[in-house]
Regions:
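A helix-coil-helix interface module used to build multimeric assemblies
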Residues: 1-147
Length: 147
């Protein structure tokens, strides 16, 4: 029997993930998540700010949630403890927050957006930044010759 700290939300609800799924789907997806770490955390931070400013999170809960997210953000993607068996970034961050600030507050981050919402927003931010950096690079390497 595992302790409560060892069980992810999905595992408690659906049972353990198939090792084939973990090896063939989740492990290869980790580099993609690492590349988009900043964007995923920015969507979480923006959502936490909204929850706090609209008083959905009252008292010390909002500031505590924001502090936990900022701590994870500062760890950067390479320092984050990626766990392939947990699956999505959303579940991984919620698990890490639960360890840091308590499950009761960590679970409040999911009041509203779905995984699809978060993934779409993070992907748009990632691609926007990629296009902007490529445009700046191209623009700085254009030279105009006059005859």
């Amino acid at each position: 029997m595992t302790g409560k700290d060892d069980v992810f939300l999905e595992e408690a609800r659906l049972g353990p993930r198939s090792q084939v799924l973990v090896d063939c789907e989740e492990v290869p997806n980790i580099p993609r998540l690492v590349r988009r770490f900043r964007e995923y955390l920015l969507t979480d931070l923006a959502h936490a700010v909204m929850l706090t400013e609209t008083d959905i999170l009252t008292g010390a809960r909002g500031p505590k949630l924001l502090a936990g997210l900022l701590e994870i953000f500062d760890a950067d993607g390479d320092g984050f403890p990626w766990l392939a068996q947990s699956g999505s970034f959303l579940v991984q961050v919620e698990h890490r927050l639960g360890q840091r600030i308590g499950e009761d507050i960590a679970g409040l981050l999911r009041a509203g957006p779905s995984r699809n919402d978060q993934s779409a927003a993070a992907e748009r931010l990632f691609l926007r930044d990629l296009l902007l950096s490529d445009s700046i690079y191209i623009g700085s390497n254009i030279s105009f010759e006059t005859d």
